Each structure stands twice: as structure tokens, then as C-alpha cells.
Amino acid sequence: MLHTAFTDLVGCDVPIQLAPMGTIATPELMAAVNRAGGMAMTGMPGAPAAVVAEALDAVGASVAGAFGFNVVMPFLDLEVVDTAAARCRVVDFYHGAVATSLVERVHAAGALAGWQVCSVNDARAAADAGCDLLVVRGTEGGGRMHGGQSLWPLLTAVLDAVDVPVVAAGGIADGRGLAAALAAGAAGVRMGTRFVATPESGAHPEYKDAIVRAGAGDTVLTDEFRVEWPDSIVSSRVLRSAVEHAAELPDDAVTARVAMGPMTIDVPKFGVVPPTTAAEGHIAAMALYAGESAALVDLIEPAEDIIARIVRQAEGQLRSVMPS
């Protein structure tokens, strides 16, 4: 029942896509999502092509099925685009003007091209540029934000405006959300926050626990977590507690130290780096990216179990409102 234009296009079994969450979306999490029938995404903003190639080769060796790579436009590196397109089923772009040349570049390497959009105008531009699929993201979503519309009105408007598969993102964490998106006409959903709270994710245990504890109203759209980030990327949705804890630190504080391979980096107050298992310091004051769907997360559980339950819920919900 849940085969859609998205699953047919990318070659997965269920219309659930893992959001590209950088170091949080570990190869283990990506592999688990794909084993459950979904499609994993990753992203490495600012990383050079050689590092991206090594990381994607490692992912390809451990992840069965199609996976994709997200490019954040202020960090655009054409060599990275080529590297990802040669290794991934999908390369999608976010936080910048739609460029036909990038879509053509991805296609030339044999990959599908996508664009994450936050307005109807961007959706039309992406479809006109030849994108194979779009991700429509509402302000309910966690992490970096570009746009100001909530998901459901935006999704409806985009579906009326374009004729390519559309994936809905922002505030979705269960089978009802998936069913609602499919019933509205979307071809799938992209989820991030729900998968942070999994054993496979790279999130620090305190980060996972904070999401599980979060309730309605416990996230906030803020421009605080932007230190050492391009000026064009302003807002992000995080747990409200992260803003409160960070505000208590001195302006020159080192919030945490995070090991990244052979290096250890200092994370400043309101720095953009989220806490991974390799972080030490004021974890509660780091960028705890989370969408409004955090209120629906009450347990840390394996990604495969999450997807299986979401699919069952969605199928049951769709049958209940559209009986045969």
C-alpha cells in the first residue's frame, strides 16, 4: 500500500527518508533506515571533496540500497557535488537559489537531483530546473531553517504548483503524520528528530534524553546558534532548554570540545555543532536541534522498529479513512 512515486523513483520500499543530519546520521543509522526499507541521507557541510569521498565510500560499503547526499548551498563546492553524484542515488540542495546548472551536473553524473524548498516560488523554480523530486520543509522541522511557512499549507500549495514527487518534512514522527502527508498527495516524508533518539544515531546520550523529555512548546525557532556559520544561514529550531543553558555561559566560554577524527575542536557559545558521543563539556548548552515532533518522541528505540511501527500505523490509518 505504501509504494509511491518516491519509492519507485529512488528504489526503496517505504516512503520514509532519513534527514541529512551530518555527524548524527552515522553509517549505522543510515544502514538501519535502509534495512527497514527507507532511504538514508547524509551531509557534510564544509568538508572537502576528498573527505566526502572517503566518507561516502565507507557508507556505500555498509549501507545496502539507495542513499543520498545533501549540499548546503553556502558551502557549495562543485567537486563535492561531483563526488557525491558519482556515489549516491540522490543529491539534493538546500538554502540557496535554485540553479539549473547544478541539476544538470548531478544528472550528468547519473544521480537524481532534488531541492529542499520552503516556498511555492522555489518549488516552481526547482521543478522548472529539472529536479526529479522536491522536499517541502515547514518551520516545524528541527535544525537550520530557510523560510517561514508551516508544513501543511505550504505542502498543499506546492502540490498544486508542481508535477514532480514531493517529500514532506517538518514535524512528522509517527504513522499518522506519514498517512496525513500521503493523503494530502505527498510521495513520502523526511524525518530527522525521531531518528536522533535511536541507539544507532551519533547523538550524545544527553541529547537523546533531552528529546525524549521534550513536550509541546519545548522547541523554539531562534537565530542564536549561528556562531562560525555563514551569515546567510540565520534561523534554526532547537530545544528551548539549549538556548536557556547557553545564555547562562560567559560570552567567551568554550561550550564543549568535540573529537572529529584526529582533531579536537572547541565549540564556542552558541556554536553550530550538535553534541555527538565524542563531545565533552556543557552538553545541555550545545545546539540541540529538534523539531516540534520532539513532543511525540517518548522512547529511545532502534530505527528499524520505528519505521516498522510507522508503516503499520500509516497503513492502518489510511485503511480507516479510506476503506476498500
Residues of each region from the PLM?
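Active-site entrance/lid segments in N-terminal catalytic domains of soluble metabolic enzymes
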Residues: 1-165
